[in-house]
């Protein structure tokens, strides 16, 4: 595994059979040391690869703003507990929550996020490790952030606040 920059690693695609325990430990430890408090191992070979596949680790204080992409993405929780919150693009209101945990905990362990759906990820335990697949290359032209009056309050919510709130379920 090659260090590209602090918190971002690249696997050698010619040698993938497993991730060593020490590599996994490095991923978790580095998530608490980088500015945005998340680290990743890139499985894809270049920034333009499609799809883009990453093993990610989020610290509970990780900074993840409301965002939406022009492509779909999948998220599979391997360890820890997390929550996705989905927002209306019309008025910024919360439309649905999905609390996630590993399959071994018999929780919801997989979420697919459709294109152009406003969402935010929250790590609810000290560390959350997950596989993420973006069905396109991540780029500024394909990713938008919820800013302004619609999402200001949503971007200020902290994981520890969200963890004690009831889940919101859309019944439509």
Language model features with spans:
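Conserved short histidine dyad/triad with adjacent acidic residue
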Residues: 54-70, 104, 115
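Double-stranded beta-helix
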Residues: 91-98, 120-172
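Conserved hydrophobic/aromatic beta-strand scaffold that supports enzyme active sites
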Residues: 53-57, 74, 110-112, 132
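Glycine- and acidic-residue-biased ligand/ion/polar-headgroup-sensing regions
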Residues: 60, 70-90
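A short, N-terminal "cap"/entry segment at the start of jelly-roll beta-barrel domains
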Residues: 1-50, 96-103, 157-172
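Short beta-strand His + acidic residue motifs that chelate non-heme Fe in jelly-roll/DSBH
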Residues: 64-67, 84-86, 111-113, 119-124, ...
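Short acidic-glycine-tyrosine-enriched beta hairpin
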Residues: 88-119
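Short histidine-centered beta-strand/loop micro-motifs
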Residues: 42-46, 56, 64-69, 76, ...
């Amino acid at each position: 595994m090659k260090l590209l920059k602090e918190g971002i690693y690249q696997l050698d695609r010619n040698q993938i059979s497993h991730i060593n325990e020490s590599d996994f430990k490095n991923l978790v430890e580095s998530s608490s040391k980088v500015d945005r408090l998340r680290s990743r191992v890139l499985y894809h070979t270049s920034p333009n690869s499609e799809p883009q596949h990453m093993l990610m680790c989020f610290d509970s204080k990780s900074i993840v703003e409301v965002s939406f992409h022009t492509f779909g993405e999948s998220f599979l929780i391997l360890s820890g507990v997390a929550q996705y919150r989905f927002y209306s693009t019309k008025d910024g209101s919360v439309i649905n929550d999905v609390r996630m945990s590993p399959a071994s905990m018999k929780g919801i362990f997989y979420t697919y996020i459709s294109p152009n759906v406003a969402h935010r990820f929250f790590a609810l335990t000290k560390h959350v490790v997950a596989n993420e697949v973006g069905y396109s290359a991540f780029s500024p032209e394909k990713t938008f952030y919820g800013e302004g009056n619609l999402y200001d309050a949503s971007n200020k919510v902290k994981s520890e606040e969200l963890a004690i709130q009831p889940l919101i379920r859309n019944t439509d």
